From Swiss-Prot:
Keywords: Cadmium, Copper, Metal-binding, Metal-thiolate cluster, Zinc. The gene is mtnA. One of its GO terms (molecular function) is metal ion binding. This is Metallothionein. The keyword Oxidoreductase does not apply.
């Protein structure tokens, strides 16, 4: 059996892959940052991770 250790950030605008050990969990969903977890990544210029672009228009 395979154990999942990483998943895509649950934010629909984000492209980040987040380790489940380091993720910010909200309602059982993994997020890469506080701004993605609280749904404000667009308003806050993205999550700040290189290459993501979730803060882009």
């Amino acid at each position: 059996m395979t154990t999942v250790t990483q998943m895509k950030c649950a934010c629909p605008h984000c492209l980040c892959i987040v380790s489940l050990n380091d993720a910010i969990m909200v309602d059982g969903k993994p997020y890469c940052s506080e701004v993605c977890a609280n749904g404000t990544c667009k308003e806050n210029s993205g999550c700040g991770h290189a290459g993501c672009g979730c803060g882009s228009a």
